[in-house]
Amino acid sequence: MRRREFIAALGGAASAWPHAAQGQATPKTHVVLWVSTEAQPDPFIASFREGMRERGYVEGQNLAFVLRYAPGDPARLREALPELLGVPADFIVSSGPAILAMRAATGKPVLFAVSGDPVALGIAESLARPGRNFTGTTFMSLDVAQKRVQLLKELLPGMSKLAILSQKNHPGEQSEHEATRAAADALSISLAYIPFAAGPELDGALQRVAEAGANAMLVFPDGVTMVHRAKIADFALSRRLP
């Protein structure tokens, strides 16, 4: 599914919550707290606004946004948690590492999109029956983690060592690591596992990748690596590292 279609779908899910204003002469303004570790301008919010508009929720008429950003730094959101929880929002929209801070928002509906495991993150009891006050979707697929290794091997038949760059606090990261290792073992590929915890540690992690002597690099996707994707791509190009 294309990103625009997906976020429009999220808008539809969000619109199912606020029914209190129906039948009122003066429409209620529904307040959305948008919490993100994306860099500004946020690539997702324009599509979300459009999806909400298509369902009758128009910013400036019956919809308002409160925007809070901490690009690549979820710790800043955790520090700002008292302020965030004090925002008089009808529901919260969040994604990626920002969800870690939103776990404390137990009194409001939270709409999420994550690349990790919602169960490991602690925001869902199971994928089939999430429970709690969170709803959304995950892009995580352990089958895809294995396919990435297989694809690299097809592109580089002589590959014997693969560097794994991973933001270690990403929920579900351990499962993704295990699935990748199993695929690598099946193809007789050794792994150089290089974890880091946050954006400020990325330079050191990339230096360890350079020193690993790997034939290729695999980056586990999450909000932090997405924010720093240009730096990671420039590094790979400079090292001629697939």
Regions found by a protein language model. Name each.
Residues 1-242:
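Short hydrophobic alpha-helices and adjacent helix-cap/hinge residues
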